[in-house]
Amino acid sequence: SGSCATKTCWMMLPKFREVGYALKDKYSEAEYVEPVRASRYRRPVFLKIKKSSTYRKPMDTDLVYIMNSPNYCEEDPVSGSVGTRGRLCNRTSPGAAGCDLMCCGRGYNTHQYKKMWQCNCKF
């Protein structure tokens, strides 16, 4: 009589939605960084987080950026953004298609449309 004990371990990715929520949290807390050079002619040695008067190195888990994002609300031919002015939005949607987000605080006009069509109904 013999006994056998097998232990198998594996790594598993979290659910995609959990990853999305974690990235969204990181994005909302992302911090601006500046490169620090050892001398004028060298490449940057490391990045530092600039907050008012204090500087610190970012941690490995920090999400950082070196340039501000363009303003996607306004048209910008350089970045290729067409802006949101004049686009249709969904007044009841809380998401990206909703008027509150898409209109960037400029306000919006509501219109009611009546559409008639032949349904090819047979009685």
Swiss-Prot record:
Pfam families: wnt (PF00110)
Any one biological process term the GO annotation gives: neuron differentiation
Superkingdom assignment: Eukaryota
Glycosylation, residue list: 90
Record motif Microbody targeting signal, residues: 121-123
Residues covalently joined to lipid (O-palmitoleoyl serine): 1
Annotated keywords: Developmental protein, Disulfide bond, Extracellular matrix, Glycoprotein, Lipoprotein, Secreted, Wnt signaling pathway
Modifications the protein undergoes after translation, according to the UniProt entry: Palmitoleoylation is required for efficient binding to frizzled receptors. Depalmitoleoylation leads to Wnt signaling pathway inhibition.
CC per GO annotation: extracellular space
Residue ranges crossing the lipid bilayer per the database entry: none
Main location per the UniProt record: secreted
Annotated function: Ligand for members of the frizzled family of seven transmembrane receptors. Probable developmental protein. May be a signaling molecule which affects the development of discrete regions of tissues. Is likely to signal over only few cell diameters.
Protein name: Protein Wnt-7(I)
